[in-house]
Structure formats: structure tokens, C-alpha cells
Amino acid sequence: MSWLILSLLAVSFFVIYDVAGRYLATRSENPQAFAVIYNLGVALMSPLIFLFDQTIPSDITPYVIFMTVLGLVIWGLNGRFEYFAKKHTEASVFSIIIKLGPVMSFFLALIILGETFTLSKLAGVILIVTANIILLAGNLRHAKIDPKGVRYTLLLALILSVAWLFDAVNVKAWGVGVFCMFSFFAPVIMSSFFPTIKKKQLVRELKLTPWWQFLVLGFFNLIGYGFMLKALTLGEASNVMPIATSTTPFVVLIGILLLGERDSLARKIFSSILVLIAIYLMR
């Protein structure tokens, strides 16, 4: 399969993960404990990736190990700070600011990885950003903006952009399955010990959200992430990341088609069309 097909498969699984994740997050009492249970479950499911990608680690040099450790520390920080960002930021504000992550990743890939710059890539990124702004900016009128929340979310967007950049470098050496396992174990360690999580907090979260729901949620994120990593082995990060992470307009389309959410219908449809044009330009 081409990087484009893999990126589209990734975004389709991320959309389901996004919708399901929003539902489960409303029931969480302790997002730190939630993150530990969720990421541990996904890490243990990671061998499923070998069903469609049997790549094994190769050419593991000291440089690769160094880059991998840095990348996993960054993923650990992502898992740790995501809680603070969402705690202090309304969803409408968070959704807009976090989209800076793929944009920063796009430019970092061009600068650091030396990937090819084309006007079609730039136009595609601009269209995706514009679509998200059109779709979500209207919600800001009624949102309360907490400066602390904005700082945390900006930090999270920066962390994500760098983490994806390391993914593009590291996955080629480790293979998709092994690197998936590493990436989900890193937040478990960071969330478990900084600060230390208590057993009773984990038990309480499992009472609020049954274990099988964690696994279903994790399955969609795992497969989506696996497709994204595989796409990064075949295409440039500056192409893959803007498409694989353009979930918001597709989530909105699901709301229109399946949930009957018809408010601001013209704006929603227009935003979705912009994303489809962007994908065509970046194919």
C-alpha cells in the first residue's frame, strides 16, 4: 500500500478513537490513572501489529538507541502533560491549539529531515489549518480561556510535533510493531512515577471504566498509530502527518451523518471539503 492509503487508514482509526475517547474521558475521575491503564493495555496489545507488518529491528547502532531514548522520553512527556492540558483548557480551545502540532511537525520535517518542499504541500497544510479554524473558531465565543491551559496546550502541541519527528526517524530501525510497544510503554512509566500513582487510584478508574472498554479504545488508537508509522516508512513526514492527524472534520461528518448534528451545517460541510482538497493536493 502507498503512504497515502496508509495515512487515510490511520486517520479513519484515529477518528473512531477520538469519538470513543471523548465519551470515556467524561467518566474518568483521575486522568493520570486513566492514562496508566490505557497506555499499558495498548502496549500489551502492540504485538497485534505484527499481523500486518513483520518488520523486525535492524541496524541498531548507538546513534539509533540515543535517538530512540530521546523520542520515548518525549512520548512519555506527552502522556504526562496531556492531563494538565485538558484539565485547564476547554475542549473548543484545546482542539484549535493542538492542531499547531501537525503544522510544526510539517516545518520541522522540512528543516531537520531535509524533506522536499512543494507548493502543493504548503497549500494542503494551509487548507487543513483553515478547515479546523473555520470549524472550531465559532466555539471560542463562549469559551473561557485559561492562560495556564493555553500554555500547557501549546507545550503539548510542541511535544507532539517533536515526537512525530522522532517517529519518522526511529520506526525505520525498529519496525512498526516493536516501536509501537515502546511508544505506549513510555507514557506508562512517566505517568506512574511522576508523581507516583497509587493502586487504589487505578482500582477506582477500573470501576468507573471496565477493562474491556480500555482495550477497545486502545485497539483503534494502536491500529491507527501502526498505519501512521508504516506510512512514515514509505512517505515523507511532511506529507503523512498533516493527513494522518486531520481527524476533526471527519469526526464532524460522523456527527452529521450518524448523530444528526445539523447545527452550523454549511460550515461543517465546507471545512470537510477543504480537508478533502488538501488530501488530494498532498497525495
What is the predicted role of each segment?
Residues 9, 36-37, 70, 97-100, ...:
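Hydrophobic core positions of alpha-helical segments in small-molecule transporters
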Residues 33-34, 94, 179-180, 240:
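Juxtamembrane helix-start motifs in multi-pass secondary transporters
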Residues 1-89, 137-152, 174, 185-234, ...:
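Membrane-interface interhelical linkers
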Residues 1-9, 100-158, 162, 168, ...:
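Juxtamembrane helix-loop boundary signature in multi-pass membrane transporters
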Residues 43-54, 105-120, 159-177, 220-237, ...:
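Hydrophobic alpha-helical transmembrane segments in multi-pass integral membrane proteins
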Residues 13, 74, 101, 159, ...:
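MFS transmembrane alpha-helix packing/gate-lining sites
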Residues 41-45, 97-111, 186-190, 224-227, ...:
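Alpha-helical transmembrane segments of compact multi-pass small-molecule transporters, enriched
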Residues 14, 42-46, 128-131, 157-160, ...:
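Helical transmembrane-bundle signal
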